[in-house]
């Protein structure tokens, strides 16, 4: 009887747990065969370590195979997912034929790792990261064209790796990375970001925000309502139906040539305010700079964001090419430098080179504020010395000790430290665009809890930490990041552009690595969307880079992994984020291509395409890529006072949507600057020459789709 009862209990146990028992019985040789099959599949695309099946389980009628993280580096697409399932199914013993197969890696099934942008069936029920801004931060009113299937009303935070910084343990300024192959990473990544990537994104309609100075111009002019520290620059006001008044609270003031521990120029002055009108006699504020020498200068404005701020403050920039107008949404971005554009200015002070702000608006009774205007990039003005509290260890971005002091979101200015003297403070003596983000953020009025988490003890760690925290400060108060205080800018994504270290003993290429992080903030963004969207972003950008480089330059270009790892820049931002390691700046085989400006253009365009694909997918939009530059340009005199420009479009074999339908032609006369352009339908343009003209320049047409 006891034997029979024991036998019945054994049968019951077997019936309760048949799947687990069968799963554990998957033979070792079958697991190894599946791993080898996945290895073979992966190495068609990616350089990856051995893939193995770590464990097996059954959920209902589903057989789950859990592969290690190397499997997650495969760029999964619907076609290769189907091939993988077909191939693995063929390797399973017959007794598993009744189960539905699911292969999992990186805590997801492999079909879930197909980026949403590349799925044939769009699941509109899945949460996307798609913040809605009624109006973007800055809109160029004078532009003859607004992209409709591009990046209009999108805000992108990005940065170009490291920069010149103060190393307190050596009491000197230095590069964060080594000099090699005629460059250093701190400058090398700028050769992609500033001349290529940022203009591509802006031409597609995006507002691009950088935590480093973007202007290579070493001169800088500050014009402010509180007076100018140097030169003969002038701030003036003209009152119409409404009067300017002193704003309540703090604003910018330029009180000293250099700034030290935690000093914030945006907390040392005042600002001006006025009510808006819809029609009538407008009031204006004017900033008239004294330009030190003729050249190109970036123009930044500043203001304060108030509860009733206008979302369409009208700025007009007078420059060598005429006038260009912008509408700035002052409901976001107050208390820092906001970039408008880069323009040509003549040396000296005159009414043809100035910035004007009007109180004309689409709505009556709102508030427009006016503070300082910054023209040019300038030289570094943040002075550093060893902290009274000493220095701390230079931890790597991926160091697990950084997890113990992840930024909490408590963004505020500390009480300013007043040293007994300024002896031993050192300026960088470098152009500001060379400096690390930590110093630009101080000059830009960002709270010191953002740019100096170490409280002044370690600029190395502060620099890489501040970039991610800065993203959260930009987005703080918006729907993207409603729980933190900040600038209310609905940032759509963040991107860190790095080059990597590492060498090979032969002519092998190190190649392209993507890094993202999901295991933070409960694996969700504020709107409930999954942080695995950062995986999608990483996959799309890496895939575009590798495909384009293999097609146009090097068929053996190495695709490295997609690391889901806790790098500070990837972990901290509360928006979809990718950290790119494009290539190894230490490896000759990589830098054979990396020093070629044509290669840099191709890579930057690939990054832009990946961003465009990702962002449009979040809004369930079709995307259109900006066409390639035109060629076969020719200029013909059609009569004594008329000239015709002709050109031919260039087909993009890598992108079927990049087809030119319209063009923008820019013109400059004599030694002036280019105008705002005119939109033309065909591939020719005629214009009448002004009387007495000595020289005319017509630029390569900007391509529009």
Model feature map: region roles:
Residues 159, 428-535, 563-586:
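Active-site microenvironments of hydrolase-like enzyme catalytic domains
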Residues 283-307:
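A short beta-strand element within beta-rich, extracytoplasmic domains
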Residues 694-704:
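Residue-level detector of conserved catalytic or cofactor/ligand-binding positions
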Residues 305-323:
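Short, surface-exposed beta-strand/strand-loop-strand elements in extracellular ectodomains
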Residues 267, 353-354, 360, 372, ...:
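Active-site-adjacent mobile loop/cap segments within catalytic or ligand-binding domains
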Residues 65-174, 370, 374-385, 413-426, ...:
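Non-catalytic propeptide/linker segments at domain boundaries
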Residues 320-349:
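Extracellular carbohydrate recognition and processing domains
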Residues 616-657, 703-705:
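Pro/Thr/Ser/Gly-rich low-complexity, intrinsically disordered linker/stalk tracts
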């Amino acid at each position: 009887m006891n034997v029979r009862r024991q036998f019945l209990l054994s049968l019951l146990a077997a019936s309760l747990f048949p799947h687990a028992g069968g799963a554990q019985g998957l033979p070792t040789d079958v697991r190894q065969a599946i791993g080898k099959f996945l290895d073979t599949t992966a190495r068609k695309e990616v350089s990856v370590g051995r893939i193995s099946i770590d464990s097996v389980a059954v959920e209902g009628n589903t057989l789950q195979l859990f592969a290690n993280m190397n499997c997650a580096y495969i760029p999964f697409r619907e076609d290769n997912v189907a091939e993988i399932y077909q191939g693995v199914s063929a390797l399973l013993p017959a007794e598993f034929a009744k189960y539905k197969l699911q292969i999992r890696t990186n805590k997801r099934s492999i079909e879930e790792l197909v980026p949403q942008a590349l799925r044939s069936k769009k699941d509109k029920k899945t949460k996307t990261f798609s913040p809605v801004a009624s109006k973007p931060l800055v809109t160029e009113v004078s532009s003859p064209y607004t992209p409709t299937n591009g990046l209009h009303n999108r805000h992108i935070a990005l940065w170009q790796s490291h920069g010149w910084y103060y190393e307190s343990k050596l009491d000197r300024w230095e590069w964060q990375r080594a000099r090699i192959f005629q460059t250093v990473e701190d400058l090398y990544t700028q050769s992609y970001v500033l001349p290529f990537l940022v203009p591509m994104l802006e031409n597609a309609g995006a507002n691009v925000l950088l935590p480093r100075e973007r202007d290579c111009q070493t001169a800088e002019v500050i014009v402010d309502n509180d007076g100018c520290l140097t030169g003969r620059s002038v701030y003036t006001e003209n009152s119409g139906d409404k009067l300017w008044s002193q704003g309540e609270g703090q604003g910018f003031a330029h009180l000293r040539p250099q700034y030290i521990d935690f000093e914030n120029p945006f907390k040392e002055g005042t600002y001006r305010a006025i009510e808006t009108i819809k029609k009538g006699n407008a009031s204006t504020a004017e900033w008239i700079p004294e330009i030190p020498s003729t050249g190109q200068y970036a123009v930044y404005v500043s203001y304060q964001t108030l509860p009733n701020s206008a979302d369409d403050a009208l700025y007009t920039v007078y420059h060598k090419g005429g006038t260009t107008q912008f509408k700035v949404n002052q409901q976001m971005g107050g208390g820092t430098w906001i970039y408008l554009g880069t323009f040509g200015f003549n040396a000296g002070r005159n009414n043809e080179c100035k910035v004007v702000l009007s109180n004309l608006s689409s709505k009556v009774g709102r508030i427009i504020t006016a503070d300082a205007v910054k023209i040019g990039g300038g030289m570094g003005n943040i002075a550093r010395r060893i902290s009274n509290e000493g220095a701390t260890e230079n931890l790597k971005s991926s160091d697990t000790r950084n997890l113990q002091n992840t930024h909490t979101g408590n963004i505020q200015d500390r009480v300013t430290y007043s040293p007994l003297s300024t002896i031993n403070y050192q300026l960088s003596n470098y152009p500001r665009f060379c400096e690390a983000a930590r110093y630009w953020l101080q000059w830009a009025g960002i709270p010191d809890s953002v740019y100096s988490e170490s409280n002044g003890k370690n600029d190395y760690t502060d620099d890489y930490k501040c970039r991610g925290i800065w993203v959260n400060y930009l987005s703080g108060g918006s729907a993207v990041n409603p729980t933190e205080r900040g600038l209310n800018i609905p940032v759509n994504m963040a991107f860190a552009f790095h080059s990597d270290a590492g060498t090979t003993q032969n002519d092998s290429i190190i190649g392209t690595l993507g890094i993202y992080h999901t295991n933070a903030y409960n694996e969700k963004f504020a709107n409930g969307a999954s942080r695995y969207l950062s995986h999608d972003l990483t996959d799309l950008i890496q895939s575009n880079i590798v495909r384009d480089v293999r097609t146009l330059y090097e068929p053996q270009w190495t695709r490295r992994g997609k690391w889901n790892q806790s790098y500070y820049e990837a972990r901290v931002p509360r928006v979809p984020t990718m950290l790119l390691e494009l290539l190894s700046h230490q490896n000759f085989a990589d830098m054979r291509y990396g020093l070629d400006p044509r290669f840099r253009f191709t890579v930057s365009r690939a990054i832009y395409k990946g961003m465009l694909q990702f962002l449009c997918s979040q809004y369930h939009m079709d995307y259109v890529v900006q066409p390639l530059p035109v060629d076969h340009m020719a200029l013909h005199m059609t009569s004594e006072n008329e000239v015709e420009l002709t050109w031919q479009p260039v087909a993009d074999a890598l992108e079927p949507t990049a087809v030119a339908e319209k063009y923008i032609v820019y013109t400059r006369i004599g030694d002036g600057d280019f105008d705002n352009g005119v939109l033309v339908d065909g591939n020719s343009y005629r214009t009448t020459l002004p009387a007495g003209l000595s020289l005319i320049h017509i630029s390569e047409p900007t391509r529009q789709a």
